[in-house]
Regions:
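Alpha-helical DNA-recognition elements
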Residues: 33, 37, 49, 67
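Short, charged recognition helix plus adjacent turn
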Residues: 62-69
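Recognition helix of helix-turn-helix/homeodomain-like DNA-binding domains
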Residues: 26-41
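DNA major-groove recognition helix of helix-turn-helix/homeodomain DNA-binding modules
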Residues: 45-60
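Phosphate-coordinating loops and pocket residues in cytosolic domains that bind phosphorylated ligands
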Residues: 22, 36, 63
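A short, Lys/Arg-rich alpha-helix, primarily the initiator
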Residues: 1-18, 23
């Protein structure tokens, strides 16, 4: 499972979904799905834009969470 840390990163910078959407041009719905970790797929361009905007590494935004079977 891929874990998205967008909500944590946005919280640290005190950014709202509207702020990120407005400043990056990314659709608000896309940001919302990433924020709430309900996105099933996302364009790499979106991930790149978010990382550049938040000045973070890909590994800060996304992580693979190993399942315990």
């Amino acid at each position: 499972m891929i874990k998205c840390h967008l909500s944590k990163l946005m919280g640290e910078k005190r950014l709202s979904i509207a702020d990120v959407s407005r400043d990056t041009g990314i659709n608000r719905g896309v940001i919302t799905r990433l924020y709430h970790e309900t996105a099933l797929r996302v364009d790499l361009e979106v991930i790149e834009t978010i990382c550049l905007y938040l000045d973070c590494e890909l590994s800060d935004l996304l992580a693979i969470e190993k399942s315990h079977k």
